[in-house]
Amino acid sequence: MQFLLSGYYGFGNLGDEALARVIVSELRARYPYAEINVLSARPEVTAHELAVRSTPRAQLSAVRDAIAGADVVLSGGGGLLQNATSLRSLLYYAGILRAANRAQRKSMIFAQSIGPLDFVGKTVVREWCKGTSCATVRDARSQQLLSSLLRDIRIERTADPVFLYDTPNGAIDLPSLGVDGAVPLVVVAVRKSPGFQHAARAIAYAVDRFSEKHHAHVAFLPFGGSDDADAATELIRKCKSSPVLLPLTNIDEASALIRSAFIVIGMRLHALILAIRYGIPFLAVAYDPKVSALCEDIGYPLSPLWKYTSARSFTARDVDVLVDRVWEEREALASAVAAHAEQMRRLAQRNFEVLDELVRA
């Protein structure tokens, strides 16, 4: 049995690297004799870190050979079938599925968020992804959208595989990262996006509120590598307080940091997923529908700190209320988040159960 995994792998995005690690681990547990091949921007690094075969994703002849050699092609996880990033990105991922289906390989849209898609994007998914064997998606909105485009395949709503991620044992050395371990830690994970300047003002105000009223230590975690570090640096300049920018790290250290946090402020979806995984209350920054969908899925009682559909401005009063509430209600929120984490872990396992059914078919 040979699996080919297509996703945003090898770019140094910690959330996607966590996805790859969980998926590979689960495949090994279920199919111990299978061969796993991961399409990657840095195949040497991916092959070393995951102990798999890895094919350079930009070498189309090598990708075609990898598809031809696979029994099952998995597209995911993540938000691959969308053209908010670019039409080129959508064509790449939809093209992998089209090639797999033309080669009569079993194929699966695996644990994805679908959209945003404009008219052209919907046409690409409808025409290029038809014939896909089955699909699992991370939220109800994605299920509804994909069902309208691919009417003849089974589509099940599950949850992100990163809910199954396990941080290695051992406490992280916070002082070595410039963090006072004796003071409550607020971890912030931001990224550039449309509307970032508006979101940044709300986040900076919240950071100052945590620092000045609640005496927290605030640290920015660059989840998406150097691009996120640049976004964090820009945001830190807007703060009156003195938050720190943590060094670029690996997913084990990043998840340990989130697990040790008092509160998380997250634009990055997988930073929020790890916060939920470890029962850490959070303030979401909903730059994309997938962030709003995650909050809705767990019934999170706090509104996002900023939302892509909201007015471009924010009120200091609204931010004050959210910051003070997450701080004062932390224990109750932590218990609620932890309870939902178990449900999301069960849903995350469903991705692999659906895959098992496909393999046996």
Give the residues covered by each predicted segment.
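Active-site anion-handling motifs in enzyme catalytic cores
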Residues: 1-361
